[in-house]
Amino acid sequence: MAHIPEVLPKSIPIPAFIVTTSSYLWYYFNLVLTQIPGGQFIVSYIKKSHHDDPYRTTVEIGLILYGIIYYLSKPQQKKSLQAQKPNLSPQEIDALIEDWEPEPLVDPSATDEQSWRVAKTPVTMEMPIQNHITITRNNLQEKYTNVFNLASNNFLQLSATEPVKEVVKTTIKNYGVGACGPAGFYGNQDVHYTLEYDLAQFFGTQGSVLYGQDFCAAPSVLPAFTKRGDVIVADDQVSLPVQNALQLSRSTVYYFNHNDMNSLECLLNELTEQEKLEKLPAIPRKFIVTEGIFHNSGDLAPLPELTKLKNKYKFRLFVDETFSIGVLGATGRGLSEHFNMDRATAIDITVGSMATALGSTGGFVLGDSVMCLHQRIGSNAYCFSACLPAYTVTSVSKVLKLMDSNNDAVQTLQKLSKSLHDSFASDDSLRSYVIVTSSPVSAVLHLQLTPAYRSRKFGYTCEQLFETMSALQKKSQTNKFIEPYEEEEKFLQSIVDHALINYNVLITRNTIVLKQETLPIVPSLKICCNAAMSPEELKNACESVKQSILACCQESNK
């Protein structure tokens, strides 16, 4: 028998009046309960409970009495509240409703600060000649005709060819212009499954899955395969869709320096050693997350080194190839073909967009058959978002056939991309003001202000901007207005305006939603080329853009 310390009493004394009162209450309560069917079971429960813990009986009785009193008091409370309500006539109620002004959904100060962005957004009205468009801005107050378009992501322009147009017309006649709903609820038609097969065949994977919106593909796929306790190691310059995917994954996320394989290996080695010491009950899923051609900088991910590291440390590789599919490789098959590697073994999950080089809309995911099957029951965007219209799907199937039979468009695009890059990278007059961050193989050229020029003109650095963003995020401020950043955005827009007004050339700023960004980023200009341009057209347009950059930068120095 266990020894009982002397400090504990052998019994807890109960005051006599409590014992007497409880005895009378129990006697009469017992008489009442014995007259009720099933009451003997309640009596038996109370006896056992009271024998083990007398105070428990008191607490339970008190709670029962409180519940009865609370229930009985509710009707009276309702009556008192009803009496306090003003007796208004219908006319008075209508007058109050008419006078009521709801609070704005958006902070008016934020609307004023962002209004210039809306005014500067171009709207395409028509395209009489390929790559030459008519646009309007600021609610039709500005109109520009015969503008040379260097802002389109339709890199191959195959969707604008007659064979694809004929396929689209036929599909609309046969299928109409919309889908019935999500894929699992009669949204998918035969053409959707045909395109999934075509994508898998073209890119050399076991399967593929279509998504209605390319922006939602990554944020739906990655969370479908991760949970709490899993580990993700991501590049610190991934785009907003991938950032959303990381936030929704519920995993522990680590970042390595942009395209720095030494930084990545050090981090992978550290995590592997940490896992050995922790002796986890289950092996976590582990992913390396990066992009093929980076959305915000245009440079290239080193796939061979990434594949070696993911095999060495037993990680899976997730690559967003929104801007590399249709652009890289001899036949436009993306990052793996560019490095002469087998996609099925090099990359575990590939996310792509049909709204860029393929010239349609929506997104897709490539991988093995098990991964594809799991998405159909576990990916939110696949299960709950509406399917693509049939004509957008058949157009991509036709584009893939054209790419497979003839790679002239891809080869032309790659030559123009290199020419675009060399035109700006080799110009010494620009080096004091802007730097080219893109790879020569990227169809999108990114121009950022040099750190020295940004610091001199706007008084901040990329690191300082990120620190300010992080501080605002900790304060839960959704309206992230940072004046130096806004001034730089307006300055870059002045370059866009100068090229448009003086040379009829349309370029664009890199669209950044600052309040959504969670990683370091700075504004940049974007210049896009496509396979339908002639080398001479592109050269002349590049010269015009360079003149606009020099004019605005030199003017600001005065």
Swiss-Prot record:
The chain crosses the membrane at residues 50-84, 342-371, 425-457. Pfam families: Aminotran_1_2. It is an enzyme of class 2 (transferase). One of its GO terms (cellular component) is endoplasmic reticulum membrane. GO terms for biological process: ceramide biosynthetic process; intracellular sphingolipid homeostasis; sphingolipid biosynthetic process; sphingosine biosynthetic process. Its EC number is 2.3.1.50. It comes from the Eukaryota. Residues 1-49, 372-424 are lumenal. Its cofactor is pyridoxal 5'-phosphate. Pathway: Lipid metabolism; sphingolipid metabolism. It is a multi-pass membrane protein. Changing V191D: Loss of activity. No effect on interaction with LCB2. InterPro entries: Aminotransferase_I/II_large, AON_synthase_class-II, PyrdxlP-dep_Trfase, PyrdxlP-dep_Trfase_major. Its main location: cytoplasm. Residues 85-341, 458-558 are cytoplasmic. The modification Phosphothreonine is found at T121. LCB1 and LCB2 encode essential subunits of the enzyme and form a heterodimer. Component of the SPOTS complex, at least composed of LCB1/2 (LCB1 and/or LCB2), ORM1/2 (ORM1 and/or ORM2), SAC1 and TSC3. Interacts with LCB2 and TSC3. The first transmembrane domain is not required for stability, membrane association, interaction with LCB2, or enzymatic activity. The second and third transmembrane domains are required for stability and interaction with LCB2. Component of serine palmitoyltransferase (SPT), which catalyzes the committed step in the synthesis of sphingolipids, the condensation of serine with palmitoyl CoA to form the long chain base 3-ketosphinganine. This is Serine palmitoyltransferase 1. It comes from Saccharomyces cerevisiae (strain ATCC 204508 / S288c) (Baker's yeast). The lineage of its organism: Eukaryota, Fungi, Dikarya, Ascomycota, Saccharomycotina.
